[in-house]
C-alpha cells in the first residue's frame, strides 16, 4: 500500500534532520533567528540545503524522566512535520528548558505553534533585509 501524495509531503525523513555535530555547530555558533519562552528555545539559521531541517536537544538535566523527554521530542517533531511547508529553508534546533516536563501535551503543541509562527516572521524579516547575492 503506497502513501498518497498528500501524505508524502508531510513526511519527516532523514534529510530533514540535523544529525551530527557538523550540522548543529553552525546553528549554535550563529543563530540570527531565535524564538523562545520560559520552557522552549528555538535557534535557527538560514539553510543552504533548500529545506527546513530540525535538530533536538533535550537534556536529562532539564527533563528528568525519559518518558517526558520522549514525549517532548515526539511533539516537537510532529509540530515541525506539520509546519514544514510554511517554514523557509532553515536549520532549526529545539532546546528544552527547565519546566518543560510540567507542561501538558496540549500546552506543548500550542507553544510550538506560536514559536514556529515567530520563527517564520523573523526569517521573513531577515531575508528581506539581506541583500541579494549575485554570483
Swiss-Prot record:
What is one Gene Ontology biological process annotated in the Swiss-Prot or TrEMBL record? tRNA 5'-leader removal
| Entry EC no(s) | 3.1.26.5
* Known catalytic reactions: Endonucleolytic cleavage of RNA, removing 5'-extranucleotides from tRNA precursor
Looking up InterPro entries in the UniProt record yields: Ribosomal_Su5_D2-typ_SF (IPR020568), Ribsml_uS5_D2-typ_fold_subgr (IPR014721), RNase_P (IPR000100), RNase_P_CS (IPR020539)
What does the UniProt keyword field contain?
A: Endonuclease, Hydrolase, Nuclease, RNA-binding, tRNA processing
Xref: PROSITE patterns: RIBONUCLEASE_P
User: Would the keyword tRNA processing be found if you checked this record's keyword annotation?
Assistant: yes
Give this protein's Gene Ontology molecular function annotations.
Answer: 3'-tRNA processing endoribonuclease activity; ribonuclease P activity; tRNA binding
Q: Which domain of life is it from?
A: Bacteria
Spell out where the chain crosses the membrane.
none
- Signal peptide extent: none
**What general EC class does the enzyme of this chain belong to?**
hydrolase
Q: Which GO terms describe its cellular component?
A: ribonuclease P complex
- Record's subunit section: Consists of a catalytic RNA component (M1 or rnpB) and a protein subunit.
Check the record and name the NCBIfam families matching this protein.
Answer: rnpA
- Similarity comment: family membership: Belongs to the RnpA family.
Instruction: Quote the function comment for this protein.
Output: RNaseP catalyzes the removal of the 5'-leader sequence from pre-tRNA to produce the mature 5'-terminus. It can also cleave other RNA substrates such as 4.5S RNA. The protein component plays an auxiliary but essential role in vivo by binding to the 5'-leader sequence and broadening the substrate specificity of the ribozyme.
For this entry, the protein name equals Ribonuclease P protein component
